[in-house]
Amino acid sequence: MDAEPFVVVGGDAAGLSAASKFRRTAPDREVRVFEKGRWISYAYCGMPYFIAGRIDQLGDLLSLSPAAADERGIDLRRGHEVTAVDPNEGVVHVESDEGGESNEGGESIEQPYSALLVATGGRAATGPFDVRELDGAFTLHDMDAAAAIDAYIADPESYDPGRVADTPVDRERVKYNAAQPAPETAAIIGGGYVGVEMAEALRERGLDVHLFQRSGHVLQPFGKAVADRVETELAERGVTVHTGTPVDALRGEERIEAVAFDGGEIEVDLAIVGVGIRPNTELLDGTGIELGDSGAIRTDEFGRTNLDSVYAAGDCATARHTVTGEETWMPLGLTANRSGRAIGATVGGEETPVGDIAGTAVVKAFEMECGRVGLLDEESAREAGFDPVRETVTAGSRSGYYPGNAETDVTLVADRE
């Protein structure tokens, strides 16, 4: 039996999936999870629907409570930030905050490990915008942000703080945003998954919404045929879509007042910046860890890095694409959970490959639902050695005589041979 615990850095999807599987695989061994924040294991994809008002309680998005983690035999330490990794000594350096658990507030810890999983996730990219400078400017990157946006949108006289009850939310931030005048016009910068779903959410809350996309169409991974349908749906629902229109600046003194772009500016009192995410890998600077072209941690078929006994999973790690066989980075929840479980089994003594990924994703735009899988980008297909052909067909979603039948567009990309 290993004298030192299996140490996990990060208490979200990949980290807690790994810890849970490890405990099932090796019930006599110890696993310790360090999470620098207060939140663990929540449904990121559900946050736009909380903001829309379709989900009443923020706590409904929590997948695993600290009490449930304890019942699984997981030594979970929230409020504990791993600040450095020493792979030569096999230890991590940890700082606990004033509200930390299982430790005196502010104390430093040197924690040895038998194996280490880095599951530090990703963070919202902001491009040239510093959303911290202006009230009413946000990124939707965690549960505190979702709660703050929801509070900011609400009328100060009618905001219900019960929507965030029984959660570790930043209550001062919520209180501050709930006291602001309710916005009327919103700009969403970025037409990816978050941008499209937030456009729906904000329209449902009664705002005038402008969606800005730098490239020629929204939802780049889905291709133009799907994007055209989505843009039509957004427009019919009252969203003004600005494609091929990069936003240059957020204007305002203390509160967001306008977004500026080539050719003009639009007055707004809410801005959501959703221009992608970046992997959190700075923790491993100076360790000799290998990173992929995306900046994510390079891993093999079992989630192992080039450092001895160090694994990586989730939004901070690469994976292999099932179509091309090449290294890729697709920060999606399904990938994080699956790779975490596989690594937990491997470290527990049952070597399990993390599996290739096919890039499966779904997104909803009002009443339109879109899904994708595989390799849709023809340029990438050519780079992978294929001779791609593309075709879009329209068919019924079910037999024509059955109620609810609707048109379904399917875009297929195949190798010519």
Language-model features: where?
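FAD-site-proximal beta/loop scaffold in flavoenzymes
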Residues: E133-N177, E254-A258, D262-A345
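Conserved N-terminal Rossmann-fold NAD(P)-binding element of oxidoreductases
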Residues: V9-G10, V118, I189-G190
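Beta1-alpha1 glycine-rich phosphate/pyrophosphate-binding loop at the start
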Residues: M1-D75, V196, E200-F222
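Nucleotide donor/acceptor-binding cores
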Residues: E4, R29, A115, D135, ...
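Haloarchaeal acidic low-complexity proteome signature biased toward cell-envelope/secretome components but also
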Residues: M1-F6, A13-L16, K21-P27, M47, ...
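A Rossmann-like FAD-binding core segment of flavoenzymes
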Residues: D28-E30, L76-G105, E110-Q111, R205-T299
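Mid-to-C-terminal Rossmann-like scaffold of FAD/NAD(P)H-dependent oxidoreductases
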Residues: A319-R416
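Rossmann-like NAD(P)H-binding beta-loop-alpha module
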Residues: D144, A148-V226, R237-V239
